[in-house]
């Protein structure tokens, strides 16, 4: 067999490996991967062809570029690991000329769901290139975050391509075997304490600190050691020397120091927007600037949780230091490096006045001192016309919600689906009854409303759930509400700032958690446009089961990872499930960089207590 060698030498700090063998040189370890692939299987798809390869567990799916079979491998290693070399050996390269071009990956669905076939299957400039695509036989991405044991680790995602495509010749180049050898050395420099002085860090403006003492006492009564720190103490350097160019960066550096000095795992940010015409904040926010669908900036609380980059250094989200964070302008490329894996479990209580904070604190205490009914309420309909995307008139909302039910087999289920009933606040309220642990709504959204369609009825909206419906929710048990849709957790709106819906003093998600005598204990949704993936493009999540794209990618997949973390990974705390969703989505869709996937990762926000024991403590 003819062997072609590729050798890359570098010194990088890596994430996520499985140790396969130990190198002969002291202190060095190896990861060895040996994968066999079948001859490409060709199938006709109208005027295009599709490729499949046995041994490839997913596909490279970049809009406007050929869909290429791909094998992904994820590994975990200790924080600070140095990669010394990566060597790839491939078998003899064979070629095959195709009758038709390989089908391009579909363009992202527009938020309104209305696209024509020409827009969806637009071929990018790669189809006029003479270069092979992908540009090499393998690629990788690295990141730093928390593993399932709450330990700081680094993650490596390898992508191996058994097929490469020359569009000008309409010819594929393929291999039947690839061997990768990664030599690395674990670092002796571990910045984290062996034992945690505090589990939970509460950061707050001074004006809210007195009220939060009751929450600190409650948390410590259940063994969650808690430190309450005010923003003034951060800015004055009372605990650590002040670092950072502006207030959000000073806070982020403080969180980094708290991790390394106190062993913090959970971070609760307290404070939302200050009431008024001009936008001011009790607790600062970070706007990021990934352009997509006419949205040029939006809030991402993930900024405060993504502390370390792939080198184990501070991750600023502003690589060029120009003060524009997460920069990817409409006609440019990604400027700033972002790791995207959370390094703490983080949530926010977006209270605007003391009265609202009291409501949230009392609800948390009542919730954790109770044991909730194992019940979930689900609602969804037909979100998109999926036929142009290769679908079969699937009802995406129901598919995603039904998948959620699979992860919670011992839960009572109450479904509000079309056509069995109208999707309305009244029917959702009836399904909720006295309460539940979870509520999952999957459809379309705005800051003040969630809704969807009946089957094939895309010109008419269901009544759904509107902010003016919330005063009538008097459930005694408060669910964690996951709201799938655009801007469903946009918490910066006001009567003078509401670009994606009707003016309102506050949004749907944060109104749910400040509702007195009902509503939610926490919400998860999006501060921006997430990406939707109707139709069928192959096994996008690489689990070996080809399902509709709405459960394998996009905002449906993000929400399902949250429920998978709770139901299948036995994660007990709310912030752990949020972290699992973000990290798992990042594993699959960070590379290659896509504006829409970064939007989805950035925007998925937890409004609630990350240290919340899901379902309560009491038996």
Predicted regions and their residues:
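Positively charged n-region of N-terminal signal peptides that target proteins for export
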Residues: 1-8
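Bacterial N-terminal signal peptides
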Residues: 8-16
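N-terminal signal peptide
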Residues: 15-23
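Cysteine-dependent hydrolase recognition
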Residues: 23-619
């Amino acid at each position: 067999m003819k062997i072609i060698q590729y050798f890359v030498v570098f010194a990088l700090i890596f994430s996520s490996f499985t140790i396969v063998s130990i190198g002969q040189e002291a202190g060095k370890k190896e990861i060895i991967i040996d994968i066999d692939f079948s001859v490409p299987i060709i199938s006709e798809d109208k005027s295009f062809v599709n490729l499949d390869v046995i041994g490839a567990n997913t596909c490279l799916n970049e809009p406007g570029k050929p869909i290429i079979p791909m094998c992904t491998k994820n590994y975990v290693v200790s924080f600070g690991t140095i990669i010394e070399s990566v060597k790839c050996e491939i078998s003899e390269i064979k070629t095959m000329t195709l009758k038709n071009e390989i089908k391009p990956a579909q363009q992202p669905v527009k938020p309104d769901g209305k696209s024509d076939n020409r827009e969806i299957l637009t071929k990018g400039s790669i189809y006029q290139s003479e270069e092979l695509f992908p540009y090499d036989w393998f690629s990788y991405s690295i990141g730093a975050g928390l593993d399932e044991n709450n330990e700081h680790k680094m993650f490596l995602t390898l992508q191996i391509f058994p097929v490469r495509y020359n569009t000008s010749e309409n010819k594929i180049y393929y291999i039947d075997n690839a061997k990768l050898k990664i030599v690395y050395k674990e670092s002796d420099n571990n910045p984290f304490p062996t034992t945690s002085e505090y589990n939970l860090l509460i950061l707050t403006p001074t004006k809210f600190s007195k009220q939060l003492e009751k929450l600190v006492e409650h948390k410590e009564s259940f063994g969650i050691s808690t430190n309450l720190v005010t923003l003034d103490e951060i800015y004055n350097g009372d605990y650590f020397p002040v670092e950072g160019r502006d207030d959000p960066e000073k806070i982020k550096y403080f969180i980094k120091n708290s991790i390394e000095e106190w062993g913090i795992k959970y971070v609760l940010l307290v404070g939302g927007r200050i009431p008024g015409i001009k936008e001011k904040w009790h607790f600062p926010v970070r706007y990021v600037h990934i352009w997509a669908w006419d949205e040029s900036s939006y809030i991402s609380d993930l900024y405060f949780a993504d502390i370390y980059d792939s080198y184990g250094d501070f991750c600023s989200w502003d690589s060029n230091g120009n003060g524009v964070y997460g920069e990817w302008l409409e006609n440019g490329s990604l400027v700033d490096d972002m790791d995207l894996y959370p390094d703490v479990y983080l949530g926010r209580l977006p209270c605007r006045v003391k009265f609202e904070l009291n409501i949230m604190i009392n609800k948390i205490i009542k919730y954790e001192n109770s044991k909730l009914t194992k019940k979930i309420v689900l609602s969804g309909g037909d979100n998109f016309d999926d036929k142009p995307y290769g679908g079969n008139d699937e009802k995406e909302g129901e598919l995603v919600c039904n998948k959620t039910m699979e992860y919670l087999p011992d839960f009572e289920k109450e479904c509000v689906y079309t056509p069995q009933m109208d999707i309305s606040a009244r029917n959702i309220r009836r399904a909720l009854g006295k309460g539940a642990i979870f509520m999952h709504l999957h459809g379309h959204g705005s800051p003040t409303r969630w809704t969807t369609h009946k089957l094939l009825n895309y010109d008419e909206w269901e009544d759904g759930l509107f902010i003016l419906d919330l005063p009538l929710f008097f459930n005694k048990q408060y669910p964690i509400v996951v709201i799938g849709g655009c801007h469903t957790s946009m918490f910066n709106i006001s009567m003078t700032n509401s670009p994606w819906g009707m003016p309102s003093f506050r949004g749907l998600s944060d109104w749910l958690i400040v509702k007195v005598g009902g509503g939610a204990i926490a919400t998860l949704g999006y501060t921006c446009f997430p990406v939707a993936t109707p139709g069928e493009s192959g096994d996008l999540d690489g689990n070996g089961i080809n399902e509709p794209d709405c459960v394998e990618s996009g905002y449906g997949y993000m929400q399902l990872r949250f429920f998978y973390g709770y139901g299948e990974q036995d994660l007990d705390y709310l912030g752990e499930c949020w972290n699992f969703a973000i990290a798992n989505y990042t594993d699959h869709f960070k590379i290659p960089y896509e504006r829409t996937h970064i939007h989805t990762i950035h925007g998925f926000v937890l409004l609630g207590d990350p240290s919340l024991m899901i379902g309560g403590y009491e038996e």
